C-alpha cells in the first residue's frame, strides 16, 4: 500500500546523548523523505555533539566519542537538514514526545527557525497504541505468550496481572 500524499513526508529518527531534550544532544539523524509520487530519498548524518557521549547512551546506539570526533557539529549542518525537511510533514516513532522537541531544541541552539506551524506530525507510536488492544488479555499474550483463560473472572485477572508484572519486570530489570 502506498501513502496518498499531497506533500512530502519525512520519516526520521534521532540517536542522542540522552533523553533530556534541553540538555542532551543529537549524535545521529536519519531522514527518509517520501514524495507524493512515491520517490524516496534518504540521508543520514553523524553529528559531533560537542559533549562526551555517556556510556549508557553508547550501550543503546553504539555511537562512541571516537566515531563522532571528526563528524560535523549540529550547528554546521542544521541549515542543510532544515532545507531538506522544510517542505515536508514529519513522522517518527515517539516523535511527538521526543524526536521533534529534540530536533527543535537543536535547531534553536543553531539559530535555525524550525517552524512546525504548517506541518503535520505523524507519531507512529501513537497510532500503534490506538490500534493495538490495550487489555489485560493483550498484555498477557504479549508478556507471557499465553492466552488468558477465564478473562474477567477476578481470580484469573488477578493471577494474570501478577504474571504480566513478573514478566515485564524481568524485561525492565535486564
Go through each PLM region and give its residues:
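Acidic two-metal-ion nuclease catalytic site recognized across multiple nuclease folds
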Residues: 1-4, 164-174
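Conserved non-catalytic scaffold segment of RNase H-like nuclease domains
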Residues: 1-118, 133-152
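Short, glycine/acidic-enriched loop or turn micro-motifs at the edges of active sites
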Residues: 16-18, 126, 160
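Acidic, divalent-metal-coordinating active-site segment for phosphoryl/phosphodiester hydrolysis
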Residues: 153-167
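A short, structured active-site edge motif that brings together acidic residues
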Residues: 116-128
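Short, charged, surface-exposed loops that flank catalytic or proteolytic processing sites
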Residues: 151-154, 174
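Active-site flanking residues adjacent to catalytic metal/cofactor-binding acidic residues
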Residues: 12, 122, 156
Amino acid at each position: 500500500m502506498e501513502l496518498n500524499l499531497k506533500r512530502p513526508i519525512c520519516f526520521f529518527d534521532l540517536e542522542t546523548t540522552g533523553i533530556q531534550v534541553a540538555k542532551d544532544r543529537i549524535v545521529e539523524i536519519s531522514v527518509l523523505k517520501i514524495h507524493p509520487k512515491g520517490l524516496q530519498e534518504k540521508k543520514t548524518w553523524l553529528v559531533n555533539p560537542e559533549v562526551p557521549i555517556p556510556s549508557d547512551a553508547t550501550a543503546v546506539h553504539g555511537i562512541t566519542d571516537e566515531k563522532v570526533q571528526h563528524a560535523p557539529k549540529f550547528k554546521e549542518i542544521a541549515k542543510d537538514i532544515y532545507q531538506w525537511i522544510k517542505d515536508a510533514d514529519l513522522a517518527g516513532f515517539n516523535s511527538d514526545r521526543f524526536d521533534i522537541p529534540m530536533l527543535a531544541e537543536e535547531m534553536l541552539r543553531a539559530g535555525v527557525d524550525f517552524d512546525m506551524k504548517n506541518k503535520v506530525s505523524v507519531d507512529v507510536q501513537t497510532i500503534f497504541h490506538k490500534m493495538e488492544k490495550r487489555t489485560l488479555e493483550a498484555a498477557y499474550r504479549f508478556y507471557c505468550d499465553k492466552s488468558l483463560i477465564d478473562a474477567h473472572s477476578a481470580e484469573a485477572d488477578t493471577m494474570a496481572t501478577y504474571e504480566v508484572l513478573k514478566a515485564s519486570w524481568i524485561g525492565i530489570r535486564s
